[in-house]
């Protein structure tokens, strides 16, 4: 199919001179043409040679290679982003496999921990509780008039690192970089926001460099009222925006999602995005083994909002494959620090209640313990799939993995906790303990493992396979909501792009070099379901594909023409 493109048209720019060079979305640096240098008062402000973006990217790549630590590389890339965003995305696109772990997990974790120390330049919006009476003014100060995607955090549960206060801003910045890199969403349409509601991290409160509000976190009614005020202000400024909740604490994540998912186009990536990519991976892994997800028994370590969100999405997929909901729930076992979730346990959270196992079904289990540990569960359930979302390293022990492998010749093991320092077990250990027979997918990137002369690719079950395509699909279709069915469509589409499924061998997930193709396909599937469900205006398939193409931004310089403000 041939698409028409509008991206070769000139841009009319009201800025000139040093102001233009300081505008990251518009700055071309040494790539301004001689005509543009004359028209925009740039003569003498740049070296003589007019370069192409590829020449600029090659210089930046050479400079990047001169940095020895991942955090220094991260700082360097962020400086380019804050100087020339088009060059930043061209550079990332040229070296995606190398740089994605640097701009996001795992390196972004260290960047969040050291946010106030390595701070260079403002990016995004910092909304402090102290300024709660000035929300409209704060959002009016944002120069982007056509914001289409916002990622917002309150910094309380950053990856597996806990409360990082305003340091959590590193996550929305990094996440939106992936919306652009993987999903083609123009950086001009994106906005990172951190809600500064204080911090309970004493190390930050004692740090003289900490740039956030030095106050214990506000809670309960004060907190929820503040979040509501912010969201109402966002709705007033950008009524059609897609709002992604990111790294909120377990106690707040699900209530906020349930409160706002039908009020504003929104989703929680930790709960729904993680669930969608995990289900897509499991569908592909099951099909690659010649079976269906409905034939598997699944054990979770970690029963927080993310783990339970994944479990509910798995159950929905099992039901789609023809199994009753009651039977589907009997195939999913949730283990937390208090053991297997069972009926009658005290202090269960609302979202955990439907995921408990009935004690009467466990009467014949081989155990003498009142608290059923992960090892007890693995020994008695004999699962095909083991998923870790605990945030605690090393909990998938050799004994547990070997016990699983004893009853399952091709176990699927997914230690998903981020960053790498929090992973439940390393791929190297899992493969060693299973004689190379496990199928391993992780949340953070790991290098291929060589065992007995054979190399094993490690699939990264990363949300970046899902959320950029969802964002692109929402924008292209004009969807007003993100529904469960749209998320399921994303999972199915990801599974269809699995090399293991399509070729009978290879990794369970597509290579990163193919991620834009996957994102476009997910965008189409998501947009189509949105239209079918009535949350987007129905169009032809051709029109939806054209809208996806029109909205897919590429890091290329456009010609500038000068205009007055």
From Swiss-Prot:
Domain of life of the organism encoding this protein: Bacteria
Binding site for a divalent metal cation: 246-247, 270
GO cellular component, as recorded: cytosol
CDD domains in the record: NAD_bind_1_malic_enz
Residues bound to NAD(+): 157, 270, 418
Keyword annotations: Metal-binding, NAD, Oxidoreductase
EC number, UniProt record: 1.1.1.38
One MF term in the entry's GO annotations: malate dehydrogenase (decarboxylating) (NAD+) activity
InterPro entries assigned to the protein according to its UniProt record, in alphabetical order: Aminoacid_DH-like_N_sf, Malic_enzyme_CS, Malic_N_dom, Malic_N_dom_sf, Malic_NAD-bd, Malic_OxRdtase, NAD(P)-bd_dom_sf, NAD_malic_enz_proteobac
Pfam families from the UniProt entry: malic, Malic_M
Subunit structure: Homotetramer.
Protein name: NAD-dependent malic enzyme
Lineage: Bacteria, Pseudomonadati, Pseudomonadota, Gammaproteobacteria, Enterobacterales
């Amino acid at each position: 199919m041939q698409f028409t493109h509008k991206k070769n048209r000139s841009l009319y720019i009201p800025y000139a001179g040093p102001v233009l060079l300081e505008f990251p979305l518009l700055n071309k640096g040494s790539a301004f043409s001689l005509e543009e240098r004359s028209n925009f008062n740039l003569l003498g402000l740049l070296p003589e040679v007019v370069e192409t973006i590829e020449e600029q990217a090659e210089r930046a790549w050479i400079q990047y290679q001169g940095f020895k630590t991942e955090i220094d590389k991260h700082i360097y890339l962020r400086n380019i982003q804050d100087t020339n965003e088009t060059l930043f995305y061209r550079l990332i696109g040229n070296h995606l496999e190398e740089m994605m772990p640097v701009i996001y997990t795992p390196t972004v974790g260290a960047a969040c921990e050291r946010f106030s120390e390595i701070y260079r330049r403002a990016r995004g919006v910092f909304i402090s509780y102290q300024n709660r009476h000035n929300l409209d003014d704060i959002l009016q100060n944002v120069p982007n008039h056509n914001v289409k995607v916002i990622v917002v955090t309150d910094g309380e549960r950053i990856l597996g690192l806990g409360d990082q206060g305003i340091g959590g801003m590193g996550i929305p910045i990094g996440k939106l970089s992936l919306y652009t890199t993987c999903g083609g969403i123009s950086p001009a349409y994106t906005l990172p926001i951190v809600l500064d509601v204080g911090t309970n991290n004493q190390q930050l409160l004692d740090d003289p460099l900490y740039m956030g509000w030095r106050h214990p976190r506000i809670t309960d009614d004060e907190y929820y009222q503040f979040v509501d005020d912010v969201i109402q202000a966002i709705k007033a400024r950008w009524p059609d925006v897609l709002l992604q909740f990111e790294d909120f604490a377990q106690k707040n994540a699900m209530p906020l999602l349930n409160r706002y998912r039908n009020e504003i186009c929104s989703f929680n990536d930790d709960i729904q995005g993680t669930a969608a990519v995990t289900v897509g991976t499991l569908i592909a892994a099951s099909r690659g083994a010649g079976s269906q997800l409905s034939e598997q028994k699944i054990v979770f370590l970690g029963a927080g909002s993310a783990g339970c969100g994944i479990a509910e999405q798995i159950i929905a997929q099992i039901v789609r494959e023809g199994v009753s909901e009651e039977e589907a729930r009997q195939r999913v076992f949730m283990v937390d620090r208090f053991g297997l979730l069972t009926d009658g346990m005290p202090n269960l959270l609302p979202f955990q209640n439907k995921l408990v196992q009935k004690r009467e079904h466990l009467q014949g289990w081989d155990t003498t313990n009142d608290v059923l540990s992960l090892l007890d569960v693995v020994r008695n359930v004999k699962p095909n799939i083991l998923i870790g979302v605990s945030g605690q390293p090393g909990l998938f022990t050799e004994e547990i993995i070997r016990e699983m492998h004893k009853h399952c010749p091709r176990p699927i093991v997914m230690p998903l906790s981020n960053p790498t320092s929090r992973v439940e077990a390393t791929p190297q250990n899992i493969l060693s303990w299973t004689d190379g027979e496990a199928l391993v997918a992780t949340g953070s990137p790991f290098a291929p493992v060589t065992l007995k002369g054979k190399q094993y690719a490690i699939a990264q079950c990363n949300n970046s396979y899902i959320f950029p395509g969802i964002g692109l699909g929402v924008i292209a279709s004009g969807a007003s909501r993100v529904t469960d069915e749209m998320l399921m469509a994303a999972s199915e589409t990801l599974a269809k792009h699995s090399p293991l499924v399509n070729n009978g061998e290879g990794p369970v997930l597509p290579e990163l070099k193919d991620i834009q193709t996957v994102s476009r396909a997910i965008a189409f599937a998501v947009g189509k379901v949105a239209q079918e469900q009535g949350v987007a205006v129905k169009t032809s398939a051709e029109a939806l594909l054209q809208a996806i193409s029109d909205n897919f931004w590429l890091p290329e310089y456009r010609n500038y023409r000068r205009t007055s403000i």
